[in-house]
Amino acid sequence: MAEEIIVALFPCTFAEGGECTVPAGSRVVLGLGWAAKNRGLVQNFLQAQTTTISIDDAAPVDISDSYSAIGPFPDGGFATRIRHDTGVTLSAGESLQVDGMLAVSHVVPDGVIDETTNRQAFFRPEQPLSIHCRITATA
């Protein structure tokens, strides 16, 4: 059985320019999560969110019900996560394109302060998060 490699979709999309690499022979597991300063804010997110993904331009799949139970961080805060096994094992040079959308039905605060405005940050229905990550296997 191929070794699982978890690809964190938010870092791939927002910090790594939408591209990441995994070792050849890896089975790709997608990771996604939401964190906030208290359990109630995470529960609010879970009740408001719709999360979909598409792999290699296939029809989008609704994974909204795949979030884990809410759990605490050791240093404070709470999170819920998705671990989505694609079932795909990549050989050297092969790639997988993941596209998705995370939207909410109402304004969701996450309890953090925006470093630019020094105000609380909010996730809004009119500003869904687009997920785009090309995962390529290297030798």
Report residues per predicted region.
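Aromatic-rich surface patch/π-platform used for binding flat ligands and interfaces
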Residues: 92-94
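Beta-strand-rich recognition domains
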Residues: 1-55, 59-88, 97-139
